[in-house]
C-alpha cells in the first residue's frame, strides 16, 4: 500500500499492528467495552460500532459507517490504552487538561474559533446539528449541548452568538474523569 496521507495513514498503520497483538479480554475488562464473538462493541457519540479483532475492521450497526481514519485510530487507541472511569459532574476546559497549555493555540483556532464563526450567527443551525448528533440541550451559553463521547466520558459544546459589540465565541468542555 502506498501511503498518500502520512498524517493519518502512518499512525493508523502503527496502531493496527499494536491492535493485532492486543489481549482482547484484558482490553474489555480495562475499558468496559464488551468483547464477544471476535469483536468489540463500542459506542462513539451515540453511534454503535463493531470492531473485529485481531484484524481491525469497523462496521456501524444500523448502517452507519465510520470512514474517518482519525476516528478509527482514536477507537483503536482507546482499546489499546484507555481506562473506563466513574463519571464526573465536573468539566474542564482544554487549557486545564494536562497537555492543554502546550496545544491551546492550535486548538483555539481549529476548534473554538471555527465553531464560533461557523455557527455564531446561526444558532438554529448549531442546535439542529447538535440535535442530529444526539446532543442533549443545556441551559448554558446562548446554545449548549452535552454529548456522550465514549463510555462515561462526556463533552459539552457551548456557543455564544455574536452581535454588534462582541464577536461570537465557543467553548468545549470535557468531563473531569
Task: List each language-model region with its residue ranges.
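Short Lys/Arg-enriched alpha/beta "domain-start" segment
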Residues: 1-38, 71, 78-133
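Amphipathic, interaction-prone secondary-structure segments
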Residues: 27-53, 136-161
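Intrinsically disordered, low-complexity regulatory segments enriched in Ser/Thr/Pro
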Residues: 47-73, 160-177
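Short, charged/polar micro-motifs that form catalytic or ligand-binding hotspots
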Residues: 61, 65, 116, 143, ...
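Conserved binding-pocket/active-site segment within a compact domain
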Residues: 120-177
Amino acid at each position: 500500500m502506498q501511503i498518500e496521507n502520512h498524517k493519518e495513514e502512518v499512525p493508523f498503520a502503527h496502531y493496527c499492528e499494536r491492535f493485532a497483538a492486543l489481549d482482547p479480554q484484558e482490553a474489555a475488562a480495562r475499558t468496559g467495552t464488551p468483547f464477544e464473538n471476535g469483536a468489540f462493541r463500542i459506542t462513539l457519540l451515540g453511534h454503535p460500532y463493531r470492531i473485529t479483532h485481531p484484524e481491525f475492521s469497523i462496521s456501524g450497526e444500523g448502517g452507519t459507517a465510520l470512514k474517518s481514519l482519525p476516528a478509527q485510530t482514536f477507537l483503536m487507541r482507546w482499546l489499546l490504552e484507555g481506562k473506563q472511569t466513574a463519571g464526573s459532574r465536573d468539566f474542564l476546559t482544554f487549557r486545564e487538561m494536562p497537555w492543554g497549555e502546550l496545544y491551546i493555540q492550535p486548538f483555539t483556532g481549529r476548534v473554538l474559533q471555527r465553531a464560533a464563526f461557523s455557527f455564531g450567527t446561526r444558532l438554529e443551525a448549531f442546535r439542529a446539528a447538535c440535535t442530529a448528533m444526539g446532543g442533549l440541550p443545556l441551559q448554558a451559553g446562548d446554545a449548549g449541548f452535552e454529548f456522550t463521547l465514549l463510555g462515561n466520558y462526556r463533552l459539552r459544546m457551548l456557543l455564544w452568538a455574536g452581535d454588534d459589540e462582541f464577536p461570537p465565541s465557543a467553548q468545549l468542555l470535557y468531563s473531569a474523569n
